[in-house]
Design a protein with these regions (language model features):
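Short, glycine/charged-enriched secondary-structure capping and boundary segments
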Residues: 32-35, 57-60, 79-81, 103-108, ...
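Glycine-rich, flexible N-terminal cofactor/catalytic loop recognition
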Residues: 2-70
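Glycine-rich, highly charged phosphate/nucleotide-binding loops
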Residues: 71-79
């Protein structure tokens, strides 16, 4: 299994990017997340209608693929082929970190099995936010 985390995306560095998205305020996205999403050939979205709000705000024009709990198994072979053909593919959820109470775990497991790079892009965290205001 190859898991990488780098501060700057190199040109044409393919793999599956797990990109965290804002939990409430669209301005809470990181610069790195925007950079990765703009360089992605494809963005896998839990709900393209919800994701479009975020992507439009930051002028991100990557191709969208709907990837939710009802079609993620069906999409799996197509997405793996994209990743094997050196495409940059990002996975986002409607809010927060993909694969945590969201679709994506099946794809991540398949990438691990196929030795495809997985690059996490951290972002806002409900846990750290809750802890910070707990006193």
């Amino acid at each position: 299994m190859i898991i990488k985390s780098k501060s700057i995306l190199k040109d044409n560095e393919n793999g599956l990017y797990l990109v965290s998205t804002p939990i409430g305020n669209l301005k809470d996205i990181t610069f790195r997340a925007i950079e990765v999403l703009k360089k992605s050939s494809y963005i896998l979205c839990e709900d393209t209608r919800v994701s479009k709000n975020l992507l439009d705000k930051y002028d991100i024009k990557s191709k969208l693929i709907s990837n939710h709990k009802f079609n993620e198994t069906k999409n799996l072979s197509k997405i793996i082929e994209l990743l094997k053909s050196d495409e940059i593919v990002s996975l986002i959820s409607d809010a927060g970190t993909p694969s945590i109470s969201d679709p994506g775990a099946i794809l991540v497991n398949e990438c691990i099995n196929k030795n495809i790079k997985i690059i996490p892009i951290p972002g806002p965290s409900a846990v750290s936010t809750a802890v910070s205001i707990s006193g």
